[in-house]
Amino acid sequence: MGALTPLVLEAVRFGYGSERVLDGLSLRVEAGEGVALLGANGAGKTTLTRLAMALRHPQQGRVVTCGRLTAGKKPEDFADVAGYLFQNPEAQLFARTVRAEVAFGPERMGWHPPRVMEAVDRVLGELGLASDAARHPYDLPGPTRRLVALAAALVGSPRLLILDEPTAGLDRGARVRVAEVVLALRAQGAAVLAVTHDLGFAAEVLDRAVVLEGKRVTRDAPLSDLLGHHPDFPAPPLLDLARRLGLEGVRPAIGTLAPLLTSPPETGTLQA
């Protein structure tokens, strides 16, 4: 994968009716970066991801996804370079089998059948879905449907992967598998932008934190700084920030993949 900047938002303004959601927001996500997009409910996180995928269009400013302006374009115009996991996976599942769902994108892009089969088998295996390949997605439990939608987003090896709450409802093993495939994609040079309330997952898979507050980016720094590893980072203490943003899975330090992701996320006061 090349060094083309996968995502650029410049002075973006967007709202629904009279309600301004983003106001002059600018953000760049470079190749190979893993960015955690954090913020309270209603901060505009999902709106930002929809702008990046041309599901919405800025009212002012511009959005450039993998070198292409999103203005006047549709999501399918970016299917060959970007993958998107909706917060609600049912919004993107339509095929009669898991295999057909995951194969749809590559087939639409004109891949030869052997290449499609190889890519689909690979991603289904990586996410533990191989035994579900012939099942109807809606016969599967909600967390497994999320994995199917993620497989469809990953199968084309996108340059930009956008995830909206990728670990919601997943068990320990599934969280580890998701982490592994995201890290592998980043190692190939892809950028990952993840909306998440699971700070434990973010700490293991992502390395940069962008916080949305007041309709724009208010903090942009290494995730380790946000976690309290840098004395000069002007952020509230970790737990105070976590409670305010509704984060879960908080730990006092970044550990290794297996211990953190195989521990159940902390809930209670840290929930939004």
Which residues fall in each region the model found?
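Conserved ABC transporter NBD signature motif
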Residues: G61-L69, F78
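Helix-to-loop junction immediately C-terminal to a conserved catalytic motif
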Residues: M53
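H-loop/switch region of ABC-family ATPase nucleotide-binding domains
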Residues: T196-H197
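ABC ATPase nucleotide-binding domains
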Residues: G228-A272
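ABC ATPase C-loop
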Residues: A153-L154
